[in-house]
Amino acid sequence: AEPLAIRIGGINIADGSANFADFSLRPPFVTAIQSLNGDIGVLSNREQKAASVNIAGKVDQYAPVSIKGSLTPFDPLQSLDIATSFRQVELTTLTPYSGKFAGYRIRKGRLNLDLHYRIEQGRLNAENKVVLEQLQLGEKVDSPDAVDLPVRLAVALLKDSKGTISIELPVQGNLNDPEFSVMPIVWQTLRNLVVRAAQAPFKFIAGLVGGSNVDLSTVPFAAGSTEL
């Protein structure tokens, strides 16, 4: 028998709200999107036509968020084109994640995030643009999941003259492949970025001493000595 035909002429959202909580973290991560307004186009399981999406709201009452694009609602892997943007999100709210994965609390900072995800027949092409403004790390947190990298040094080196960190994280892959997962790719890219940033000063020093091929990613010296 054929599945039940479903057709919704459209959805309108007026002054709505959505809550998100991740209780796998200690402390838990909890946030809310308020003042949700917008609309979603025709939803039908009999038509392969994409439904339009245009929604806007505010994270924790003040940080604007928008979701725009289109998707096939009953088979999003067939076709999806969604752009999401977050502006001026307070970074301290992300401390549960920074504590677990970076090993530090966040003292202050703002996040601007632009995500553009496109899917055609299961093939993902994603662009993730992250801008961190005036990020300051707080006290160290003991976490078995934290990266074993000089995070404070990397943050300092990645900042430009205005104290801004800009990162682009493209992701591509086949979502029909059970071995493919987006987040491990994102975390590995971030890890590589931190490693390169932390090694940059030593490579710069190597260039000053004649551009030799000597590996200066670590520089040994005697305890108490002022000579390298």
Q: Where do the protein language model's features map onto the residues?
A:
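Extended terminal
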Residues: 4, 72-74, 78, 84-85, ...
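Broad hydrophobic/π-residue packing in well-ordered secondary structure
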Residues: 20, 97, 220-223
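Elongated, acidic membrane-bridging lipid-handling scaffolds
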Residues: 1-93, 171-175, 183-187
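Amphipathic hydrophobic-ligand
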Residues: 25-39, 58-68, 89-124, 148-149, ...
